[in-house]
Amino acid sequence: MTASTSVAVGCAVGIPVGVGIIIAVCFWFNLQKRYKREEQDDRELERAIYDESGFVSFDNFGPLRDSKDEAALASSELKNPDHTSGSSEGSAHPEEKDGKSRDQEKPLGKKNSKYYVPAYRRKINLLQVRNNNYGNNARQKSVVDLPSINNSSNVSLSSSQRHITKRQISVYDQMVPVISDEGPKFFADPSSDTNTSNDQNKASMIELKHNTRQSSNENLIRKLQNQDFGSYYPRRASSSFLNGNISNASFHTRNSSITSVNKRDALEDVFATPKSAAQSQLPNTFDKDNEGIDADHSVKDSRSAITDKDKNIYKLQNNYDVGNIGEIAEEDQYENEFTNYSQSKREFIESLRPK
């Protein structure tokens, strides 16, 4: 009874555990195979990446074509019997030659390489093969059209191409140089007439740039002069009794209290309650002809002060004295020597002018 129980427990526990271990070992072997395959693919990809001739190539351009291709073309021309044969071979139909070139193009295009080649590179290779075949066909047609007398010269020319030295072209040899228009011309003849015209064009371009820069500065100065950077508060209607020392530009850009000619001897508190009966401490700068007008204003101010005292009503009109409206030009109460907008504006405009 005990033996059967132990066997049953061992089977119930051991069989699932053994099956699980076997499955885990199978998965581990598959994973190791996958890792090896991926490592091999990575090595091939790195090999293809570091292969300079596989990715960086300008062989489809005539001036930058590799010398190996030229040597291969020369050897194929030597092996081709069309060059050495006479008029009997030259009378062959061109469609047969086109068929041969197509048959040669297919194995070149579909040739499997041990390196990984992207799709765009395959297209470039196909275009390159087609261009080479087209060049071969053109050369063959030109040779066929020549008389048979010149065949010996063609053979000697092709035999001289055997001695072409094969040189391995690196990435630095295949880079296209880019030279800017401005500056010295390294590949130009200094004694040619084109250089003189280029120098004249260059001088005219420099002068044009200088003129455009100067005109743009002048336009900026005009725009800045027409703007008022210090007007943050609404202005009162100007009076006809303004002081003659204040210039007309004060209507557009108000002068600072520091630079003003008419300054108070003792500065008043502008935040105090305005009193219409307060007399101005400014010195009288009007002419003798305006003394009668000042007397009339003083009478009106005294009458208004009496009415304000009788009514005992507070009227907040401005932070300035209402009685001397004809003597005070409106100024920004927050403008001082540190926030002198008009002076800063003038200095900035002067800095823009050409010196």
UniProtKB/Swiss-Prot annotation:
It is found in: Cell membrane; Bud membrane. Keywords: Cell membrane, Cell wall biogenesis/degradation, Membrane, Phosphoprotein, Signal-anchor, Transmembrane, Transmembrane helix. It is a single-pass type III membrane protein. Residues 70-114 are annotated as: Disordered. The modification Phosphothreonine is found at residue 273. Residues 92-108 have a biased composition (Basic and acidic residues). The keyword Nucleus does not apply. Its main location: membrane. Residues 1-8 are extracellular. One of its GO terms (biological process) is cell wall organization. Residues 30-355 are cytoplasmic. The modification Phosphoserine is found at residue 142. GO terms for cellular component: cellular bud membrane. The chain crosses the membrane at residues 9-29. The keyword Signal does not apply. Belongs to the SKG1 family. Plays a role in cell wall integrity. Affects the cell wall polymer composition in the growing region of the cell. This is Suppressor of lethality of KEX2 GAS1 double null mutant protein 1. It comes from Saccharomyces cerevisiae (strain RM11-1a) (Baker's yeast). The gene is SKG1.
